Each structure stands twice: as C-alpha cells, then as structure tokens.
C-alpha cells in the first residue's frame, strides 16, 4: 500500500521546489495561522481547507502544464503561450476565489 502513495508524495516534494507552489504553500500556512488566531468555526475551517486545496491543486496542475509545454518546445510558440496563459489564469481564478472567501471569514470576525 505504501508503494502506491510514494509517487504522490514525491510529486508534493517536487512541488515544494517550484516557486509558484512554494508561494501558495506559504500563503496557506499564513491562512492556517490566521484561522487559529481567529478561532474559526468548523464550517469556516472547511471553507479555508477547501480553498487551500483548490489553489495548491491549481498551482501544481499549472506547473505540470508548463513543464509538458516546455518538453514540446523551448522556442516561442503562440499556441504554447496561450496554453500557459490559460493555465496561469486558472490559478488566478482559484486564488481570487480563495481570497474572497478569506476576506468574508475575516470580516465576519472583525465586525
């Protein structure tokens, strides 16, 4: 059973070395710390964890797409630029959604 999960854990370890993934993981750690400080409710924790998972998953998939595109060609190709930009846009959408959820939770504790 342990062997089945080895590639997945190796993938996470590899993701830590990617700048975009590392940035999202640092932001996730900050969100978790803020959650403990604010004493979030169970449902708020669920929202935070889903948002963190969504953004980190999007970032890892973006990294995969970029690397596959780089295998195809290292020279500029408009099609590859479009593919990479679309993948980056997906990360941005997930990050904005997570930020909005976080702000809603934050303001509910401040106000």
Sequence positions of predicted segments:
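Hydrophobic alpha-helical transmembrane segments
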Residues: 2-65, 72, 76-84, 88-111
């Amino acid at each position: 059973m342990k062997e089945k999960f080895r590639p997945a854990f190796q993938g996470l370890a590899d993701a830590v070395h990617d700048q975009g993934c590392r940035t999202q993981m640092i932001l996730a750690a900050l969100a978790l710390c803020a959650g403990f400080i604010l004493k979030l409710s169970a449902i708020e924790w669920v929202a935070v964890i889903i948002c963190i998972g969504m953004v980190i998953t999007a970032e890892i998939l973006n990294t995969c797409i970029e690397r596959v595109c780089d295998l195809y060609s290292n020279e500029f190709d408009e099609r590859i630029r479009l593919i990479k930009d679309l993948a980056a846009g997906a990360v941005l959408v997930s990050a904005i959604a997570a930020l909005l959820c976080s702000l809603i939770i934050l303001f509910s504790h401040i106000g």
